[in-house]
Amino acid sequence: MQICASIAQFLAWVSFLVLLATVGSSSSSESLLNCQPLDHHLVNPSRLLGFLRAMSSVNDFITNDKLWVVSSITDVSPPIYVFLQCREDLSVSDCRHCFNESRLELERKCSGSGGRIHSDRCFLRFDDRDFSEEFVDPTFDKANCEETGTGFGEFWRFLDEALVNVTLKAVKNGGFGAASVIKTEAVYALAQCWQTLDENTCRECLVNARSSLRACDGHEARAFFTGCYLKYSTHKFFDDAAEHKPDADQRNFIRSSFFPHLSDRDVTRLAIAAISLSILTSLGAFISYRRVSRKRKAQVPSCVNFKYEMLEKATESFHDSMKLGQGGAGSVYKGILPDGRIVAVKKLFFNTREWADQFFNEVNLISGVQHKNLVRLLGCSIEGPKSLLVYEYVHNRSLDQILFMKNTVHILSWKQRFNIIIGISEGLEYLHRGSEVKIIHRDIKTSNILLDRNLSPKIADFGLIRSMGTDKTQTNTGIAGTLGYLAPEYLIKGQLTEKADVYAFGVLIIEIVTGKKNNAFTQGTSSVLYSVWEHFKANTLDRSIDPRLKGSFVEEEALKVLQIGLLCVQSSVELRPSMSEIVFMLQNKDSKFEYPKQPPFLSASVLMPDEETRV
């Protein structure tokens, strides 16, 4: 009863607060990368393993109560020290997402003794020495200014007011603050000090950062400093909860009056939760009605809804002239939305309602997965006669349409092929390790690799194929995927791990280098995989490289990719590298790796030739 009374009093205390439920639009994210150079004369495998261990431990320590982590691995030589600081207004999911993106960048580009990356949402640093006492380092402090001038005479006064307010607020509020000045023009500002800084050092860092931003001439700028982050913009880039976060005095009042046992972060969370509860309670009847009338819609709360009629019109009623292709989950159409945006609309087919429910549960899981080498899911429509998914539109064709076309006008250069291979490896590595939910693609192949205007690869259909039921285009094995790309343990025994994707990736990169498609039913010396293996044994691997390149390629890179491909297609799961190891091998010229020990697995030997190539 006493607890209930306290909660009631607390709700009454916060009821006067007026908060908007909308989230401000985010500006484009920027990042600043600084690296210690890689020692090309000494590649230490234990260094990579130590790095991966240290980063893995950081991910485990990110919680609702703590969005900053100090970690170290000291049983390796040299030791590895890691520090992560996320913005205090981020969710755990967003913090982990930023951490994993930053970690991948450091892993690819900063494999030397140390490196740091600063983005709008988090800061990540690693080094081989303890840097916990380093709060100021002008050599790494930088202000990124937008070039466009403001054109407003009073803007500077409003900007200075916002920067001063947010600095004072952050120092008083444990290192974080958000503020706005809305007059003839709006200015929004956000400040974050690292949690390892005391109040005086935080103030010093933000004052220096503020001085650097005053030299900028634009509507948006950010200061990436060693111990803090400061940003302003004329566009709102944080939500209302960040700006109305209780300061230290308010938290002390709440704690002393109602909950003396709670920590600062618990009080903040309780305040936000109480406000949210008040809003939800007032809208309860309306929400209940929506849930009853749109029960199916509620199954995918994180999926942005598109009206079926709008998508039907955008695709000209799914006319064949708008059809882009067909995958394992359904047909894909080009759509032009009323605002002029071009999207890709996938019209799904299901056998039963059970499969539909399972599928949309999975859509709910993957809707937040975002990476530059993954096709982005924009939303869905689930209330019309057909279930639809809406993806970003990738302007170029799929990789197979460019790579295997005999009379194609454009022959992919070696540089383009190598960049495509790097991008695919990074996208797969993110699915396996970088996203909050591990996703095994199951159907990596050239037709599921889309190319944008710059020929950068984007992986399509990730996370979806595993929810589909069996239909007439599939054999009765119950296995999802495409023959020729299926790993033996998955095809024969149904055992699925991320190494199944590694196998398919190996086939894919061999196809990219050779320019030849792997046919699941081609036996003996006619098989692309077998031919590359034989050339490897005979030390004539260069003869496997696509002759259309006419010698215009970096032989060392091409041979290395083929050897990595052979490592990936070995029958034994244990002998195949992980995608993290593959990314490291591809990114680092001097990386050493074992030679393949087993010939490639030729999956056609376990199936009859008259079966469909899709399972």
Curated annotation (Swiss-Prot):
Keywords: ATP-binding, Glycoprotein, Kinase, Membrane, Nucleotide-binding, Receptor, Repeat, Serine/threonine-protein kinase, Signal, Transferase, Transmembrane, Transmembrane helix. It is a single-pass membrane protein. The chain crosses the membrane at residues 267-287. Gene3D superfamilies: Gnk2 domain, C-X8-C-X2-C motif, Phosphorylase Kinase, domain 1, Transferase(Phosphotransferase) domain 1. Its EC number is 2.7.11.1. Residues 288-615 are cytoplasmic. The active site is at D443 (proton acceptor). One of its GO terms (molecular function) is protein serine kinase activity. This is Cysteine-rich receptor-like protein kinase 1. It comes from Arabidopsis thaliana.
